[in-house]
Regions:
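Intrinsically disordered, low-complexity protein-interaction/activation regions
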Residues: 1-145
């Protein structure tokens, strides 16, 4: 069983055990894909999010290396199938894991109180999703602290 946690920080668990990533960029790449909920992310878009101030050719080369490291790392845990790579884009297969973010936005009552106002705080790009989550929390539970 794969569980992806996005509230109060991004982490991935397999059968209740925290998995480790080969680098912070590999972890962030997976976080971006989880945030996109199965939609594909182009190489250019991922490059911008992970390497905003790096020359494009260098950034794209770095990204390819990061993807392969991420895939190899996930293979060690037997969960590499969550990654989907097509020419020039990346995605995740959302059917293969449970995610607090997904369950929360779908209104699953077991996840309604897990959101405490923090969503992947280690990534600046995740801030854009916070207002949406806070509004949902208010809808489900009343006022957010």
């Amino acid at each position: 069983r794969i569980f992806v946690k996005t509230f109060d920080g991004f982490d991935v668990y397999v059968n209740g055990k925290l998995i480790y990533f080969p680098s912070s960029k590999a972890k962030e790449m997976l976080a971006v894909l989880v945030e996109k909920r199965g939609s594909s992310v182009s190489l250019s878009q991922m490059t911008y999010l992970l390497y905003e101030n790096v020359e494009e050719k260098t950034a794209k080369n770095n990204l390819r290396v990061i993807y392969h490291r991420l895939r190899r790392s996930l293979e060690e845990y037997g969960i590499e199938k969550i990654l989907i790579k097509k020419r020039g884009s990346y995605a995740v297969d959302t059917e293969l894991f449970v995610c607090d973010f997904y369950e929360f936005i779908e209104g699953n009552p077991d996840y309604g109180t897990l959101f405490s106002g923090s969503y992947m705080p280690e990534y600046s790009w995740a801030e854009d999703t916070l207002p949406y989550l806070k509004n949902l929390y208010r809808k489900y539970n009343g006022v957010l602290k």
